[in-house]
Amino acid sequence: MSRSGVAVADESLTAFNDLKLGKKYKFIIFALNDQKTEIVVEETSNNSDYDAFLEKLPENECKYAIYDFEYEIGGGEGKRSKIVFFTWSPDTAPIKSKMIYASSKDALRRALNGVSSDVQGTDFSEVAYESVLDRVSKGAGSH
């Protein structure tokens, strides 16, 4: 339960584990239910196109998301995959929505074990592929 009293739905944890352990999904979009009492799965996808993921982030609404971010490691070391948690809170979203998403984030974030990086996005430049790649690949050779 978060400071805002919002709980994380069991389906949210199940979907996350399906992504993390079963590689069933490439990304998950989470939202607050209509009553603003629970964080639920809004959509899952196995589409590996990062632009398809970005298209699911609305211009005027807050969301949470998990993306299984895959990238090439330099020096011919192959691919690496990291699970990234997104808090999408666009500048154009209603203030009340931004406040409840901000105060509810910790409940979801704490429930999702195995996330490598956190990305806060208020506009699309902050969640662009290159921006996220820069964040997740820091120290890529040191793990």
Swiss-Prot record:
Which superkingdom, per the lineage? Eukaryota
The UniProt entry, under Pfam families, shows: Cofilin_ADF
Where found in the cell? Cytoplasm; Cytoplasm, Cytoskeleton; Nucleus matrix
Which cellular component terms (GO) are annotated to the entry? actin cortical patch; nuclear matrix
Q: Name one GO biological process term.
A: Golgi to plasma membrane protein transport
Which terms are listed as keywords in the entry? Answer: Actin-binding, Cell cycle, Cell division, Cytoplasm, Cytoskeleton, Nucleus
| SUPFAM superfamilies in the cross-refs | Actin depolymerizing proteins (SSF55753)
Instruction: Say if the entry is tagged with keyword Cell division.
Output: yes
Question: Among its keywords, does the record have Secreted?
Answer: no
Q: Which InterPro entries match?
A: ADF-H, ADF-H/Gelsolin-like_dom_sf, ADF/Cofilin
Q: Name one GO molecular function term.
A: actin filament binding
| Gene3D superfamilies reported in the protein's UniProt record | Severin (3.40.20.10)
CDD domains in the record, alphabetically? Answer: ADF_cofilin_like (cd11286)
Start and end residues of each ADF-H domain: 5-137
This chain's function reads: Controls reversibly actin polymerization and depolymerization in a pH-sensitive manner. It has the ability to bind G- and F-actin in a 1:1 ratio of cofilin to actin. Binding to F-actin is regulated by tropomyosin. It is the major component of intranuclear and cytoplasmic actin rods. Required for accumulation of actin at the cell division site via depolymerizing actin at the cell ends. In association with myosin II has a role in the assembly of the contractile ring via severing actin filaments. Involved in the maintenance of the contractile ring once formed.
Question: Which family does the record claim for this protein?
Answer: Belongs to the actin-binding proteins ADF family.
Q: What is this protein called?
A: Cofilin
